[in-house]
A protein has these predicted regions:
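Catalytic phosphate/metal-binding cores of nucleic-acid and nucleotide-processing enzymes, i.e., regions
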Residues: 1-122
Length: 122
C-alpha cells in the first residue's frame, strides 16, 4: 500500500470511528472500482468523500467535484466532502458541499424557512 493510500485509509477509519461515536452507524465499503460510491457509507441520503491532503484547496476542489459523481452512482440526494485539517482533531475538519446541494438539504430540513415553493435551484 502506498504512503498516500495508507494516509487516506487512516483518515477514513478515524472519521468512521468519530461519526459512530456521535451515534451514526457508518462503515468503509469495499472499493467499487469504476462505479465509486464514496469512501464512507451509512449516512442515509448521503454520498461521502474523505480527503486527507496537504493541499487543502485541492482536496476541497477535487473531493467536492468527485462526490457529485459518487452521489450519482449511489443514487444519493446529497454529497459531502470531509477534509482533514492538519494537526486538528477529526471533529475540527471541514464538511464541504456544493451550494446548490446545500440548498436542497435546507429545503428538506427547514421547509418553513423558504418563502414559497418556487425557489428552485439552478
Amino acid at each position: 500500500m502506498s504512503k498516500n493510500k495508507a494516509k487516506g485509509t487512516r483518515y477514513e477509519s478515524a472519521l468512521v470511528a468519530y461519526l459512530n461515536s456521535e451515534g451514526l452507524t457508518t462503515y468503509r465499503p469495499a472499493q467499487a472500482g469504476a462505479r465509486d460510491t464514496g469512501d464512507i457509507h451509512g449516512i442515509p441520503h448521503f454520498a461521502v468523500q474523505a480527503k486527507d491532503w496537504r493541499d487543502v484547496t485541492g482536496a476541497v476542489r477535487e473531493g467536492t467535484d468527485g462526490v457529485q459523481k459518487q452521489r450519482e452512482n449511489l443514487g444519493a440526494q446529497f454529497g459531502v466532502n470531509f477534509v482533514k485539517r492538519a494537526h486538528k482533531p477529526i471533529a475540527h475538519g471541514y464538511a464541504v458541499m456544493r451550494i446548490d446541494n446545500f440548498i436542497d438539504l435546507l429545503r428538506l430540513a427547514l421547509p418553513w424557512a423558504f418563502k414559497d415553493g418556487d425557489n428552485e435551484t439552478e
